[in-house]
């Protein structure tokens, strides 16, 4: 699949403008539309996303997730998404990378109802995703490192790194969607963590950023467990 994420994300208002911006195939768009339909149905009984974000679902959630795809190498096969909630960004990425040989998304979420929802989306869309109903700390114990580790609006960086570090290997890329206050979070995180970081403006949120992290470890050279 050819994936092009370009500036102008705030112009995305529906599935067609999303498709025009990202250049996804018709088949991929149909799978994302199935995801949208299931989310709107389940949202009536489970708080998967904030109700206020539903009118802008394609920008606030679909595009916000999709922008991560172009930030990782095509060799990435094992992607771990922490605190997946309603499936953002992990399920969107799994749908977008459905045709990549050997790709598998691991969705880590402790809320059982949200996990049931994500499994249903994966079943309907054929997304290569495994849902783990477990706390992040428990999943990280003994788990294989990911090629990519991601999270969206999960926790401040100093705490988030405590969960993510055990899942980092020498080549792991961390992708974290952050809002305002990123610089303050980075300053605090550097008091406890060693890492290389770069960030770029979010394509979906004028006030947001995508943080890309490599080489995450504690000051003793080993991943922390908190």
UniProtKB/Swiss-Prot annotation:
| Record-listed S-adenosyl-L-methionine binding positions | 83, 88, 136-137, 152
EC no.?
2.1.1.170
Where in the cell does this protein reside?
A: Cytoplasm
UniProt main location, coarse: cytoplasm
- Positions of the UniProt region annotated as Disordered: 199-226
Q: What Pfam families does UniProt report for this protein, alphabetically?
A: GidB
Keywords tagged on the record: Cytoplasm, Methyltransferase, rRNA processing, S-adenosyl-L-methionine, Transferase
Q: Which domain of life is it from?
A: Bacteria
Swiss-Prot/TrEMBL catalytic activity? guanosine(527) in 16S rRNA + S-adenosyl-L-methionine = N(7)-methylguanosine(527) in 16S rRNA + S-adenosyl-L-homocysteine
Example of a GO cellular component annotation carried by this entry:
cytosol
Q: Name one GO molecular function term.
A: rRNA (guanine-N7-)-methyltransferase activity
InterPro entries given for it? Answer: rRNA_ssu_MeTfrase_G, SAM-dependent_MTases_sf
Does Cytoplasm show up as a keyword for this record?
yes
Member of which family?
Answer: Belongs to the methyltransferase superfamily. RNA methyltransferase RsmG family.
Functional summary from the UniProt entry: Specifically methylates the N7 position of guanine in position 527 of 16S rRNA.
Protein's UniProt name: Ribosomal RNA small subunit methyltransferase G
């Amino acid at each position: 699949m050819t994936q092009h994420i370009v500036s102008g994300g705030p112009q995305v208002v529906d599935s067609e403008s999303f498709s025009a911006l990202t250049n996804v195939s018709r088949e991929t768009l149909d799978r994302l539309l199935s995801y949208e339909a299931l989310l709107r149905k389940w949202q009536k009984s489970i708080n998967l996303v904030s109700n206020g974000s539903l009118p802008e679902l394609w920008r606030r959630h679909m595009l916000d997730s999709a922008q991560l795809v172009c930030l990782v190498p095509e060799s990435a096969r094992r992607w771990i998404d922490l605190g997946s909630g309603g499936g953002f960004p992990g399920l969107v990425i799994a749908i977008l990378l459905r045709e990549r040989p050997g790709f598998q998304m691991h969705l880590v979420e402790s809320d059982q109802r949200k996990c049931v929802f994500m499994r249903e989306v994966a079943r309907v869309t054929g997304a290569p995703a495994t849902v783990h109903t477990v706390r992040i700390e428990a999943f990280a114990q003994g788990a294989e490192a990911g090629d990519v580790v991601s999270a969206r609006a999960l926790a401040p960086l100093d705490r988030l790194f405590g969960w993510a570090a055990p899942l980092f290997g020498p080549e792991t890329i961390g992708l974290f969607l952050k809002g305002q206050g990123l610089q303050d979070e980075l300053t605090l995180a550097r008091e406890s963590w060693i890492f290389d970081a770069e960030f770029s403006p979010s394509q979906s949120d004028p006030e947001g950023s995508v943080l890309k992290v490599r080489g995450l470890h504690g000051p003793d050279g080993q991943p922390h467990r908190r």
